[in-house]
Structures are given as C-alpha cells and as structure tokens.
Amino acid sequence: MAIRSLPSSSRCSSSSSSSSYSLASTSLSNRLETIFKKASELCTLCDIEACVIYYGPDGELKTWPPEREKVEDIALRYSQLNEALRRKKSVTLYDFLNKKKDKTNLEKKAKITDNDDLKTCLKNVNILKYPLADHYSPDQVSQLIQSLEPHVSKVRERIRFVESQKHKETKPDHQSLASSSLNHQTQSLNPSQFSLFMYNHGDNTLSQIPVSASNFNQDYFSALLEQSELKSQIMKQDLCGYEQNMCMSNHGDATLSQIPLSASNLNQDFSALLQDESGLMQQELCGYDQNMFMNNNNFQHSFVSNTQDHSAPVVQESVNNNYGLMPHVPCGYDQNLFTSDITNNNLLINNSMFL
C-alpha cells in the first residue's frame, strides 16, 4: 500500500476550508445559544408558549425547551391550525414594510383632513365675527363708516408721532456734523498757527516774534492801522511801471519836494535837494522792493538799477549834512534800509524784489 503526499496547494486549500468551517460552526453555535435565550425571555415576558426546533449541518437535532414532550405538543397544536390562523400573527420583512407604509399614508390623510376641517372652521368663525357688508343697507353702511372714523384718526396720529420721533433722532446727528465742521474751520483759522519773523540787517539774522491769539487781532492790526494813517497824512506816492518818485521832507522850512526817479532821469543832479543846514531831515521812501544805502556826511550814488537792467551813468556828488544821522522811514512793503557812518559811501537804489 503506497501513500502519496498531497501537493502544497491542496494542503493550503484544505486548511483554509477547515478553518472557515470551524469559524462558521463557532458562530452558529453562538447564535443558537442566543436564539434559545431570546425564546426563553419571550415566553417569560409575554406569558406565551414557544418552542425552537433546530437541525444542524450534520443532522443533529436540538430543541428548546430541552424536554421533547413539550416541543412535540406545541408542534402538534400548530400543525392542526389552518393557513389563515397560522399567518395571523406571522410577519415577514415585506409585510412589515408594507404595514409601515400604509400607516404613514393614513397619518398624512388624517392631517390633510384635519387641516381642511380647521380651515373651514376658521372661515366660519371669521364670517361670524366679521360679517360681510354686501347685504348691508345704506344706513348700516353709514353707521359702519362712522364707527371706523375714530380708529382711523388714532392711527394717523400714531403715524405722525412716529415720524416726529424719527426726525428728532436724525436732527442731533446733523447738528453734531455741523458743529464738528465749524470747529474744524475755527481751528484752521486760529491765529496761533501763524508766526511773524523779523530780519536784522546788522548781523543778517532772522528772529521769530511770538503772536498770541489774544493780541493778534487787536494790538497788531491797531498799530498797523495807526502807522498807515500817519504815513498817509505825510505823503502819497503812486508807482506805474518803472516810474518811481522820491519825496524829501525839509522840517526846517516845512517844505515837501518830489523827485521823479525813472530810468530816463536817474542821471540828473539831485544832490542840491538833499542839502539841509537848518534842521534834521526825514526821508521817506514810498513804494515797494527798494534797497537804500545812506551815508552820514558825504555819500555818492554810483548807479540806480531796475529789474530790467536799466542802468544809469555814474553820478558823483557830495552832500554836506551838519546834523548827523538822518532818520529813514520806509513806506510800503518789502523794503530794506541800511545806514552807515563811514564817509564816501555809495547810494544804491535798486528796484528788484527783496524776498
């Protein structure tokens, strides 16, 4: 007798099948125990008679309850029932789903009928509470209008009150915006934001003069007004193009002389008008953008220039002044005045802008 060994593939397949069979048998035995337990609980809780008959894969018979006499008695009574009684309380999955669907449809129909009934009831209530005026007589209609007029007037008054409240709520917003804009304008026009500067020709320095908001509008402008009135009483001078005039005031004989200063007559001799032996001379230059270098005893003017390069010939003149330094009062704006005690200085009258 020869014994052959099976191939490895067959051995693997047999081992896998045996393992799956063992797992299935284990799962079946566990489930069988669960079924027997549920049948016992059902009989106890519902007070009924139940039995379980089980045939295994190998033909083994198992029952619950374990007593075979009880199982045979229950099975015999069940077999004597007709088909209708047998299926009276038996439910399959298909039957269960159909019953649930039928129940849902019945509930929907009941809700629809309930809603219809509710609508009809509300309609009847509205008809009884608010009857229609189609069948009213003219007297009844007029009475109805008179009864409604007070309610209408109350509603209109309420509407007016609500609108007035809305306007009151919106007005403060506009007022706050207006006040903020006014404050911004006053801050932008605040005089404290301005400054005055003074230029010192002696050492060529520029110094700032503090200007406060209290005296900016009063002290400064009042002094400026008094000075302008005083100067307007002394002399008036008009400038047109390159035509300029120099006014010389002689306090000795209280006379006022006017010297035309233009590009055509700048080379004329005007030194005789500057000579004064009786008193202090006051020279006032009226105009704008003029520079003047003055001498104490003897001075000479070398040239008189204009912005458009109108140069005059050199004029050498000497003037004797026995009373010292002459006060100079410039009238107008953007003027610079330089005085010196050194002899033989030059007089320079320049019509260029000094910024």
UniProtKB/Swiss-Prot annotation:
Q: Span of the secretion signal?
A: none
Q: Which UniProt keywords apply?
A: DNA-binding, Nucleus, Transcription, Transcription regulation
One GO biological-process annotation of the entry reads: positive regulation of transcription by RNA polymerase II
Principal location:
nucleus
Compositionally skewed regions (Polar residues) per UniProt: 176-186
Q: What is this protein called?
A: Agamous-like MADS-box protein AGL81
Subunit description: Interacts with MEE14/CBP1.
Q: Give the encoding gene's name.
A: AGL81
Origin organism lineage: Eukaryota, Viridiplantae, Streptophyta, Embryophyta, Tracheophyta
Residue numbers spanned by region Disordered? 1-22, 162-186
Instruction: Name the species this protein comes from.
Output: Arabidopsis thaliana
